[in-house]
Amino acid sequence: MKQISLFLTVSVILILTSCRTRTTNNALKRGEKLKSSINSFEKNRKKLSSKVVSSLEEAKESLTAENPDLPEVSKDFEKQWRSIMKRYNKMKGDFEDIGTNSRKYFGELDELSSNIHNEKLRTEELAKNKALKGKWEKIYKEAEVSVNKVTTVLESGNDFHMVLVASSIRQKLEQNVTELTNIAEQAKALLSELEVFTQQGRQLVEG
């Protein structure tokens, strides 16, 4: 009877240890996934920012040249803008992944803290998790506003292409150049703002 009791006790300890180890591993994996999605977002943000600025500057230079070939400029711009939208969709997908992975990350973190036996310590750790989650959600929502603004700016780029095509028939340039400058400035500013989100996200997962 004593042997059975001892066996059951050891079995329970092993099961609990296994569960805790699995929870710890899951939390670590979630942290790595979140970090990876943040890094991917930053990579695509940088590439998008560079691509937007260079493409718009190139288009502006072509438009302000003497006797510009508008049909040719329009074709080149369309090609560049397709590449920009492709990169933007990657960045936006990464941003959505960050949201998903961060929710799972905090879920694993709470589960890990919930396994603390000492009630006072457990309560303190869960409170820390809650405070960190609140801070993160604020940062994420602010970044979401910027991402949506980037969407609006890039839609302006799509509209600009349509105007450019029409202008290639009408041969009107002055307004186009001004509009192009505005789009470039807005895109550059918004994409720079998102760098702050990346930095804060990295601080979250790296401690």
Q: What are these model-predicted stretches?
A:
Residues 69-82, 126-138, 178-185:
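Short, glycine/alanine-rich amphipathic alpha-helical segment
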Residues 70-116, 120:
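Surface-exposed acidic loop/strand-edge motifs in secreted or periplasmic proteins
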Residues 20-86, 93:
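Immediate post-signal-peptide N-terminus of mature secreted/exported proteins
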Residues 48-58, 65, 189-207:
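Long, hydrophobic alpha-helical segments that serve as membrane-spanning/inserting helices
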Residues 2-9:
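Sec-dependent signal peptide recognition
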Residues 98-179, 190-199, 203:
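Extended amphipathic alpha-helical interaction segments
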Residues 35, 39-42, 46, 78, ...:
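Short amphipathic alpha-helical segments with heptad-repeat character
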Residues 15-18:
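C-terminal motif of bacterial Sec signal peptides marking the signal peptidase cleavage site
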